[in-house]
UniProtKB/Swiss-Prot annotation:
Record's protein name: KH domain-containing RNA-binding protein QKI
Main localisation: cytoplasm
PANTHER family xref list: KH DOMAIN-CONTAINING RNA-BINDING PROTEIN QKI, RNA-BINDING PROTEIN RELATED
One of the GO BP terms on file: negative regulation of translation
Length: 340
């Protein structure tokens, strides 16, 4: 009906969906202009991330996504504080990383347990600190007395007596599941923690999901008709330089210039009959190098001896004028009279 809102089903918890939510939260926090403006949007995003993590955690530990009843009775009586210690079996399993299993990547597993059970969960005792030097320095100091005890998990809760007992019981059951080591290849909780760490670092890639570009190319290849063609012809290798042009070279041009003049300096009678070709005004080189085209008049700047023949030895020309020395002293009339 018009005006009624259709109830949409929430997406199922999956690593890909959790990665999208984490990317949206990271994008919102990276924008300073929008930080603190969309309060309801940030709250809904945090609630959805908590829901997906909770469902994935329950699916990992309990083997199903069925939610346990979280209903609590009404509070009766004053607020009390209850606590319980669960010692970690370090002596039985000395090589197992119980602290990392309980806390999770960046403390996400412990925070998820606290949000689900309503209790505060802390790892205390020897080996609870990552920095061993700092642990030795704090040993024996006030508020650090727990370092003298064995490694344990401290669970505390504050609520009414009837409600606190239920919360504490649920938290103890969940923590006991974490204190049971699993085989190396069968630890589903460790796989989920590594997946969450990869999502936080931005390096998570789902092996079942292909990249969009690859999927599109595969789909296009499957739908397009396949045409069988012959092998491509093998082309000869490209030449390093262009071949010699078919036009005339420079030697016929030089011969044409020399034959156009008689030995006595008069023009050849056939020069006026034979019209010059289109290449008569240019010097053409056989290869395409830059700056190779020049006017042909540059050759005529130098006089050709009438008796000179192409390839013959040029005769020496005696010059009778006196060469002027560049540093020759100029003698004027007054200096010639005095003899200086």
């Amino acid at each position: 009906m018009v005006g009624e809102m259709e109830a949409k089903e929430k997406p199922k918890p999956s690593p890909d969906y959790l990665m999208q939510l984490m990317n949206d939260k990271k994008l919102m926090s990276s924008l300073p202009n929008f930080c603190g403006i969309f309060n309801h949007l940030e709250r809904l995003l945090d609630e959805e991330i908590s829901r997906v993590r909770k469902d994935m955690y329950n699916d990992t530990l309990n083997g199903s996504t069925e939610k346990r009843s979280a209903e609590l009775p009404d509070a009766v009586g004053p607020i009390v504080q209850l606590q319980e210690k669960l010692y970690v079996p370090v002596k039985e399993y000395p090589d197992f990383n119980f602290v990392g299993r309980i806390l999770g990547p960046r403390g996400l597993t412990a925070k998820q347990l606290e949000a689900e059970t309503g209790c505060k969960i802390m790892v205390r005792g020897k080996g609870s600190m990552r920095d061993k030097k700092k642990e030795e320095q704090n040993r024996g100091k006030p508020n650090w007395e727990h370092l003298n005890e064995d490694l344990h998990v401290l669970i505390t809760v504050e609520d009414a007596q009837n409600r606190a007992e239920i919360k504490l019981k649920r938290a103890v059951e969940e923590v006991k599941k974490l204190l049971i080591p699993a085989a190396e290849g069968e630890d589903s909780l460790k796989k989920m923690q590594l997946m969450e760490l990869a999502i936080l670092n931005g390096t998570y890639r789902d092996a079942n999901i292909k990249s969009p570009a690859l999927a599109f190319s595969l789909a296009a290849t499957a739908q397009a008709p396949r045409i069988i063609t012959g092998p491509a012809p093998v082309l000869p290798p490209a030449a390093l330089r262009t071949p010699t042009p078919a036009g005339p070279t420079i030697m016929p041009l030089i011969r044409q210039i020399q034959t156009a003049v008689m030995p006595n300096g008069t023009p050849h009678p056939t020069a006026a009959i034979v019209p010059p070709g289109p290449e008569a005004g240019l010097i053409y080189t056989p290869y395409e190098y830059p700056y190779t085209l020049a006017p042909a008049t540059s050759i005529l700047e130098y006089p050709i001896e009438p008796s000179g023949v192409l390839g013959a030895v040029a005769t020496k020309v005696r010059r009778h004028d006196m060469r002027v020395h560049p540093y020759q002293r100029i003698v004027t009339a007054d200096r010639a009279a005095t003899g200086n």
